[in-house]
Amino acid sequence: YSPVQVKSADGNSYLTDIIFVSAGSNHTLALRKDGTVWAWGLNTYGQLGNNTTTGSSLPVQVKIANGDLNLTNVVSISAGYQHNIALRKDGTVWAWGDNSYGQLGIGVKGNPTDSSKTSCLTPMQVVTGEQDSSSTYLEDIIQISAGPTFAMALDRKGNVYTWGLNNVGQLGNNTNTDSNAPVRVSGGLAYTVYLGDV
């Protein structure tokens, strides 16, 4: 096999102006210079973010508001196993795809509007899990990272937040309990978490 250039959505030219890519299990995300997000591959759990579960071998633009608007002003993306997270310029985090373990960070496992589904087909804004927060949503985020079935975010103050599957303690909160909303990781003398360039 040899590498091939990714075609554009119409299949007649190539996807251009890409500044970042991230690969999930069977899907790929690309962030364009204009702040839009494009996805292709398997879409069983809505990981393409286009309000369908139909896979695509060509890039499709990620939408919000049940597919009516494009996800824009994105500065960073990260693909998990079958879910994705995106960081917007305003410091908010958006997530879509599989939510079986609460890895979308929207406050519930599964789909908040249809309990028969375990996924969200378009991005939803990540909520805050902090009891003392005056905000409903996670804010002032500067970096994100998706694990296979969990996610992390770093805010401007240096706080790390985690959410999703926690079967082996990957959320860093001294439990093995999953979290469907971001919780702040506590630092201390015995342990520290660092999220950034090395």
Residue ranges and their predicted role:
Residues 26, 33, 42-44, 82, ...:
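Short loop/turn segments immediately following the C-termini of beta-strands
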Residues 1-6, 38-62, 97-122, 126, ...:
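Short glycine/serine- and acidic-residue-enriched loop/turn motifs that recur at repeat junctions
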Residues 11-16, 67-72, 115-116, 131-139, ...:
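Short glycine-/Asp-/Thr-/Trp-enriched loop segments that recur within the blades
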Residues 15, 53-56, 71, 79, ...:
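Short loop/turn positions that demarcate and connect the beta-strands within blades
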Residues 18, 23-26, 74, 79-82, ...:
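Signature of short aromatic-glycine-proline-rich micro-motifs recurring in repeat-based ectodomains
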Residues 27-30, 39, 58, 83-86, ...:
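Conserved core positions of repeat-based scaffolds
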Residues 16-20, 33-36, 72-76, 88-92, ...:
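Tandem repeat domain/solenoid detector
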